[in-house]
């Protein structure tokens, strides 16, 4: 039985290797080029169709918008854009008309405090689990902006 498995493994390797569809590179993976999307155009189109104001955060030089999609947050439609920061961190900005609590208090998150950033009050939502990322929520009147991701706190403040 073991011999049969070895023979099958050799046959599979011999059949797949010439296709060039497989590769093995031991060591740490390297980041490839970031595919850029036009977040400004996406947000402009979303502002026209969501029924709530959507803002373009105007990210600093060195940041790249790499994703834009429509999703839901708190049961309402939402515009979601993702950004690779200059330090290769990642932040996601979700804009929705849902209430702050409905949009941010998901996956076991609870409001853990507030802070002032650039003149805005930011509500911080966190969960007990390390697998659930924190969310910063900013009430912009008719719209709530939610920031989540993996980047230094200074980048979170920049996106606010």
Where are these regions (language model features)?
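Short, solvent-exposed recognition patches
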Residues: 33-128
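Ser/Thr/Pro/Gly-rich low-complexity linker/stalk segments immediately outside membranes or between
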Residues: 21-36
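A short, solvent-exposed beta-edge/loop patch
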Residues: 16, 113-160
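Hydrophobic membrane-insertion alpha-helices, especially the h-region
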Residues: 2-20
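Residues that form generic nucleotide/phosphate-binding pockets
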Residues: 17, 42-46, 159
């Amino acid at each position: 039985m073991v011999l049969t498995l070895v023979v099958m493994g050799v046959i599979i390797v011999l059949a797949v290797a010439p296709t060039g569809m497989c590769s093995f590179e031991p060591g740490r993976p390297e980041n490839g080029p970031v595919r850029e999307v036009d977040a400004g155009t996406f947000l402009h189109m979303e502002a026209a169709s969501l029924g709530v104001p959507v803002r373009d955060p105007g990210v600093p030089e060195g940041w790249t918008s790499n994703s834009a999609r429509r999703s839901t947050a708190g049961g309402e439609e939402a515009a979601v854009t993702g950004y690779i920061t200059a330090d290769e961190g990642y932040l996601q900005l979700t804009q929705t008309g849902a209430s702050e609590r409905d949009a941010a208090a998901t996956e076991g998150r609870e409001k853990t405090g507030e802070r002032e950033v650039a003149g805005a009050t930011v509500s911080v939502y966190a969960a007990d689990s390390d697998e659930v990322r924190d969310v910063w929520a900013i009430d912009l009147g008719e719209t709530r902006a939610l920031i989540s991701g993996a980047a230094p706190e200074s980048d979170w403040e920049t996106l606010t």
